[in-house]
Swiss-Prot record:
GO terms for molecular function: ATP binding; protein serine kinase activity; protein serine/threonine kinase activity. Residues 260-325 are annotated as: Disordered. The keyword Kinase applies. Its EC number is 2.7.11.1. The gene is RPS6KL1. This is Ribosomal protein S6 kinase-like 1. ATP binds at R151, G152, C153, R154, V155, V156, G157, V158, I159, K177. It comes from the Eukaryota. The keyword Magnesium does not apply. It comes from Pongo abelii (Sumatran orangutan).
Length: 549
């Protein structure tokens, strides 16, 4: 077998320099593995080689998480070596084929570690530009833990694609979201684990296995903003029982929030147009109601955690997330339904006050549904004071600004990503970026105009896509009507934004400047950037320094 000479790839501006002896040996070893996979040397003893290999791979994963890449490479090397020796004395043909796939997988990861972290020569003061070492905040690496630590926890609830988990030792609850690893590390997409982002859910720890990354997230118990608004607008149809968790949450939130007030109808507006009929809640047979209120179902890498419904069994068996937990559908009066005529009250807003009001649709019933208002289901009315919307908007803006500063784009920010804490402040669901996780966008967010027009296209995305999403969410909060309902044919370059006459001038101006079809023309981009957005007249009463502090 011929030895392979290796020469390091120079960094920009640096002259090529020969590899160290250790790096040369690494290249030789990788070449030897390729030859041994092709030829094979049956020299394995009768020990259980799978157990020995599993020990080495587990150590490799732990070292990989903690960024000790040299040790991780060595453990992968040892594990592959054990598998190569054992596969030739294993009489089970199916197991041999499975082991070959594992060898290829571990070899690929070893090569990625070598190419990304061991081969590149570093000058003094230089830092790698790929993989976990790209993290701007180095202390975040201490959050990485071995996946075995999750064995002491049990699943007590399921919230669509995330799980509510209880620590058996402390009794505390947290949310776990799993991200599938593609095992093909993107050298263009860096791993970025945001830290210290105000008004965003905290990442407490993360765990890595061979196939997944598990995010251990803070449990925000206030639920989603949209579900809270709907329950405030229609308390008799929110599915709450006396003494429920959601009732206690509302009792805690009410001193902080004065969200809903009667809306003044515009002159010439027919009261009958605002009449809605509310269907009695229907529960899913797979999960008990447990007195919980409806909540918006999250979809994403977004890594979110609204209030969960609690499983009565407490079993760690993970049930498949049901298609719908609790349905609260608002429909136009007289609209037909499979469930028969709607029962319940009809509600007409009345009274007076300088508030924002309108007829708001919820979200599409898959990932964006507010457990009630879906596309084509009619309208549910809420009225929210502009000052309150302004506060929520400012908190969301601060979170997005911090994410952008750390290099993270949300891409498909939608109502399921906006939570409320116990003090009534916005908490964005967790967003991050992983080189081993292929980014995915919520299709319903794109269809319902929460995602920018350029999302899903071939052009490179910028911060402008999140400013569109920000504008789409504000549009729904301020007008009470979703952007996709006002513009069912979508928004093109020539589309004129539909705004109600009673909307304040600063609010109308902000929405118009955010919801520009051309990304470079959106407020928050170009000269002034986010500073210009924060200085918009709509935010004139916001004291940004106190908000961040």
């Amino acid at each position: 077998m011929s030895l392979v000479a290796c020469e390091c790839l120079p960094s920009p501006g640096l002259e090529p320099e020969p590899c160290s002896r250790a790096r040369s040996q690494a290249c030789v070893y990788l070449e030897q593995i390729r030859n041994r996979v092709a030829l094979g040397v049956p020299d394995m003893t009768k020990r259980d080689y799978l157990v020995d290999a599993a020990t080495q791979i587990r150590l490799a994963l732990e070292r990989d998480v903690s960024e000790d890449y040299e040790a991780a490479f060595n453990h992968y090397q040892n594990g592959v070596d054990v598998l190569l020796r054992g596969i030739h004395v294993d009489p089970n043909k199916e197991r041999r084929e499975a082991v070959k796939l594992k060898i290829t997988k571990y070899l690929r990861r070893a090569e990625e570690i070598f190419n990304c972290h061991l081969q590149r020569p570093l000058s003094s003061g230089a830092s790698p530009s790929t993989g976990f070492s790209s993290l701007r905040l180095r202390p975040i690496r201490t959050l990485g833990s071995a996946v075995e630590q999750l064995r002491g926890c049990r699943v007590v609830g399921v919230i669509e694609k995330v799980q509510l988990v209880q620590d058996s030792a402390t009794g505390g609850t947290f949310v776990v979201k799993s991200l599938p690893r593609c095992h093909m590390v993107s050298r263009e997409r860096l791993t970025i684990i945001p830290h210290g982002v105000p008004y965003m859910t905290k990442l407490l720890r993360y765990f890595m296995s061979e196939d997944s990354i598990f995010l251990h997230l803070e449990h925000v118990q206030g639920g989603t903003l949209w579900s809270h608004l709907l329950s405030q607008a229609h308390p008799r149809h929110s599915g709450l029982s006396s003494g429920s968790t959601q009732e206690r949450m509302k009792a805690q939130l009410n001193p902080h929030l004065n969200l809903l007030t009667p809306a003044r109808l515009p002159s010439g507006h027919a009261p009958g147009k605002d009449r809605i009929a509310l269907e009695p809640p229907r529960t899913s047979p797979s999960l008990p109601l447990a007195g919980e209120a409806p909540s918006i179902r999250p979809q994403r890498e977004a890594e979110g955690e609204p209030t969960a419904r609690t499983s009565t069994s407490g079993s760690s068996d993970l049930p498949k997330a049901p298609g719908g937990h609790l349905h609260l559908q608002a429909r136009r009066a007289g609209q037909n339904s499979d469930a028969g005529p709607p029962r319940g009250l009809t509600w007409v807003p009345e009274g007076a006050g300088p508030v924002l009001g309108g007829c708001g649709r919820g979200m599409d019933q898959s990932c964006l549904s507010a457990d009630g208002a879906g596309r084509g289901c009619g309208r549910a009315t809420w009225s929210v004071r502009e000052e309150q919307v302004k506060q929520w908007a400012a908190e969301t803006l601060v979170a997005l600004e911090a994410l952008h500063e750390q290099g993270v784009l949300c891409r498909d920010l939608h109502p399921g990503n906006l939570l409320l804490d116990q003090a009534g402040h916005i908490r964005l669901t967790y967003f991050g970026q992983w080189s081993e996780v292929e980014p995915q966008c919520c299709g319903e967010a794109v269809d319902n105009l929460y995602s920018a027009p350029e999302v899903g296209g071939i052009s490179e995305l910028t911060e402008a896509c999140d400013w569109w999403s920000f504008g789409s969410l504000l549009y729904e909060l301020l007008t009470g009507m979703a952007l996709s309902q006002s513009h069912p044919s979508g928004i093109q370059a020539h589309t004129q934004l539909q705004l109600p006459e009673w909307l304040s001038r600063p609010a109308a101006s902000l929405l118009t400047e955010l919801l520009q079809f051309e990304p470079t023309r959106r407020l928050g981009m170009g000269e002034g950037g986010v500073s210009k957005l924060k200085s918009h007249p709509f935010f004139s009463t916001i004291q940004w320094s106190k908000l961040v502090g």
